[in-house]
């Protein structure tokens, strides 16, 4: 196979990985946890995965403790948890 063919194959595999959604069996367990603001009251806009709605929603994170279902961006939440 030529180097151009290998590059095309690599590009297609990369595109497939990016466009293939996370299945529920591949989803980390912490994606099932409820949003947890934690005890602090700083107030950072954050995102969490809501398994009932099957999407990432915004919530206000207090700035400490909480749980792992807490993302700075919606995109990070979706790439980690969304199906």
Curated annotation (Swiss-Prot):
GO molecular function of the protein, one example? serine-type endopeptidase inhibitor activity
Which parts of the sequence belong to the BPTI/Kunitz inhibitor domain? Answer: 31-81
Alphabetical UniProt keywords: Disulfide bond, Protease inhibitor, Secreted, Serine protease inhibitor, Signal
Q: Cross-referenced InterPro entries, in alphabetical order?
A: Kunitz_BPTI, Kunitz_BPTI_sf, Prtase_inh_Kunz-CS, TFPI/VKTCI-like
Q: Which family does it belong to?
A: Belongs to the venom Kunitz-type family.
User: How is this protein annotated for GO cellular component?
Assistant: extracellular space
For whether the record's keyword set contains Secreted, the answer is: yes
Q: What does this protein do?
A: Serine protease inhibitor.
Tell me the disulfide pairings in this chain. 31-81, 40-64, 56-77
Give the signal peptide, or none. Answer: 1-24
Q: Where is this site: Reactive bond for trypsin?
A: 41-42
Superkingdom assignment = Eukaryota
Name of one Pfam family that matches: Kunitz_BPTI
Protein's organism: Oxyuranus microlepidotus (Inland taipan)
Presence of keyword Signal = yes
Check the record and name the PROSITE patterns matching this protein: BPTI_KUNITZ_1 (PS00280), BPTI_KUNITZ_2 (PS50279)
Localization recorded for this chain is:
Secreted
Tissue note: Expressed by the venom gland.
Identify the Gene3D superfamilies for this entry: Pancreatic trypsin inhibitor Kunitz domain (4.10.410.10)
* Protein name in UniProt: Kunitz-type serine protease inhibitor microlepidin-2
């Amino acid at each position: 196979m030529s180097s151009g063919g290998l590059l095309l194959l690599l590009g297609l595999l990369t595109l497939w990985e990016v466009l293939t959604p996370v299945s529920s069996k591949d989803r980390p367990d912490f994606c099932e946890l409820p949003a947890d603001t934690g005890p602090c009251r700083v107030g950072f806009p954050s995102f969490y995965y809501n398994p009932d709605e099957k999407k990432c929603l915004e919530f206000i994170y207090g700035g400490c403790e909480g749980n792992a279902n807490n993302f700075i961006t919606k995109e990070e939440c979706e790439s980690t948890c969304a199906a």
